[in-house]
Amino acid sequence: MIIKPKIRGFICTTTHPVGCEANVKEQIAYTKAQGPIKNAPKRVLVVGASSGYGLSSRIAAAFGGGAATIGVFFEKEGSEKKPGTAGFYNAAAFEKLAREEGLYAKSLNGDAFSNEAKQKTIDLIKEDLGQVDMVVYSLASPVRKLPETGELIRSALKPIGQTYTSTAVDTNKDIIIEASVEPATEQEIQDTVTVMGGEDWELWINALAEAGVLAEGCKTVAYSYIGTELTWPIYWDGALGKAKMDLDRAASALNDKLSATGGSANVAVLKSVVTQASSAIPVMPLYIAMVFKKMREEGVHEGCMEQIYRMFSQRLYKEDGSAAEVDEKNRLRLDDWELRDDIQEHCRNLWPQITTENLKELTDYVEYKEEFLKLFGFGIDGVDYEADVNPDVATDFIAI
């Protein structure tokens, strides 16, 4: 079939398998061009491995460090009549390209929050790799099914205490609007921590440790975003921030556990990027369009792949083997360039000046839209979008 982008809300409901593969190839090419990561781990598990920072982590490990990788994710396959999710095609492309280079790559597809996911992953590690040296936790989900009760818990992207009103961009109509978000209830705050906090990361690491599949010196990292006062009301000071603070709590507990065998657990605070997750957060698209333009002008712009390569090569697995620099909460800070005073001051001053008329001129809004479509495999150089493609891509993913 010939597949064109169809946007509904902040989601593109169609995906292009060839475009998704081209995206993965682009990230692999970047990683190879940077050269090998000297002290990289050789057996890596990525939970949430099919898009965004998780996918880039798997690429950095495999193509930057020559690692055998296992990926866990929850994606839908395509059929002859309907495309699957972008993450499905990303993961399929990754496996194919890794194996072509003689790298071990296997994936498990299903609910990563479930006990079955953890058990099947443990069985696979025991069977094929023995142990793992690194566990990346990069799940972004609006819903978590509690393994013990089967109850579905939903997260809320809301402020705390009072209604948050701000200038935002309507990405469907490309106009500047005033967005208001009602505050979260106590229950919604708790639920957001349950879905997006550190509990499941702890459950994963504890299950892997008890099964004896964590190698000595195993490092684990989970991803977070703090941002700046421009986005704090909806993010860090909102329900989502409470969940991210719970990640810090989990990191501390896990670090105590892993440091006994020479390992570590850290939260890595990353920069804002265009992902399906960030496009759903009110105000983020406008902030991203502003900050990207300034960072590009300053020569410090990074996408997911650049950030993660820097995290591997300049933080966790440095060439001289020295310990990673961390902040006062033991976090790896990769948002250091975005948070530079000159960049943030530029955004603060620009924010009130943005109108529908000057949006495209004063910000990288056009590029934001292009990057958003790229997530789903569209608008990529060298891909023939008039060609007939088969959305039914064969894989040997292990079903959870």
Curated annotation (Swiss-Prot):
Which residues are involved in binding NAD(+)?
48-53, 74-75, 111-112, 139-140, 244, 273-275
Q: Give the highest taxon in the source lineage.
A: Bacteria
InterPro entries according to UniProt:
Eno_Rdtase_FAD-bd_dom (IPR024906), Enoyl-CoA_Rdtase_cat_dom (IPR024910), FabV-like_NADH_b (IPR050048), Trans-2-enoyl-CoA_reductase (IPR010758)
Q: Which Pfam families match?
A: Eno-Rase_FAD_bd, Eno-Rase_NADH_b, Enoyl_reductase
Pathway linked to the protein: Lipid metabolism; fatty acid biosynthesis
Enzyme class (EC, first level): oxidoreductase
Cleavable signal peptide = none
Write out the GO MF terms.
Answer: enoyl-[acyl-carrier-protein] reductase (NADH) activity; NAD binding; trans-2-enoyl-CoA reductase (NADH) activity
The positions flagged as active site in the entry are 235 (proton donor)
Keyword flag Metal-binding: no
The portions of this protein that span the membrane are none
Enumerate the PANTHER family for this protein. ENOYL-[ACYL-CARRIER-PROTEIN] REDUCTASE [NADH]
The task this protein performs is described as:
Involved in the final reduction of the elongation cycle of fatty acid synthesis (FAS II). Catalyzes the reduction of a carbon-carbon double bond in an enoyl moiety that is covalently linked to an acyl carrier protein (ACP).
- Protein name per the record: Enoyl-[acyl-carrier-protein] reductase [NADH] 1
Gene that encodes it: fabV1
